[in-house]
Amino acid sequence: MQKTTRTMPAHKHVALVAHDNCKPELLRWVKENKEKLQSHFLYATGTTGHMLSKETGLAIKSMISGPMGGDQQLGALISEGNIDVLVFFWDPLNAVPHDPDVKALLRIASVWNIPVATNRATAKFLFNSPLIDQEVDIEVPDYDAYLAERT
């Protein structure tokens, strides 16, 4: 597949997602990183977003709940170039009914080459990188070229 370049803005669009067992851990991480997160645009699946906003006072655009389609809403935003970073604390030890949606969200994040943090350690590395507050060029699929090849 051909690639093109997309420039991520200095103020990133960050999606925050957590499975039920991981919500307390994500909340703790968000509280610890609240000052840094305030300079970015925050999105979340419904239950996670409402909980984080209530507990931290951060402005978060909440989708609907993940099992009801919120994971897919975030995936659509990623594919449109409207999410720059995904922080997804998922529970690898417990299956969830919407597991296909979870896999699709992680797949779409990989397809569109956005950074993904799946636990506290990767989130710490990601948000302590100087790139988190800078414009960054990334390679993404050239959808126009892809479409031209297929039609």
Swiss-Prot record:
List of catalytic residues: D71 (proton donor/acceptor)
Enzyme class: lyase
Keywords attached to this entry: Lyase
Keyword Lyase on entry: yes
Reactions catalysed, as given in the entry: dihydroxyacetone phosphate = methylglyoxal + phosphate
Entry GO terms, CC: cytosol
Domain MGS-like: 6-151
Keyword Lyase part of the UniProt annotation: yes
Gene Ontology biological process: methylglyoxal biosynthetic process
A molecular-function term among this protein's GO annotations: methylglyoxal synthase activity
SUPFAM superfamilies named in the record: Methylglyoxal synthase-like
Gene3D superfamilies: Methylglyoxal synthase-like domain
EC number of the protein: 4.2.3.3
CDD domains referenced in this protein's UniProt entry, alphabetically: MGS
Amino-acid positions noted as binding substrate in the UniProt annotation, renumbered to this chain: H19, K23, T45, G46, T47, T48, S65, G66, H98
Family the UniProt entry places it in: Belongs to the methylglyoxal synthase family.
PANTHER family: METHYLGLYOXAL SYNTHASE (PTHR30492:SF0)
Function, as annotated: Catalyzes the formation of methylglyoxal from dihydroxyacetone phosphate.
Name under which the protein is recorded: Methylglyoxal synthase
Protein species of origin: Vibrio campbellii (strain ATCC BAA-1116)
Gene, per the UniProt record: mgsA
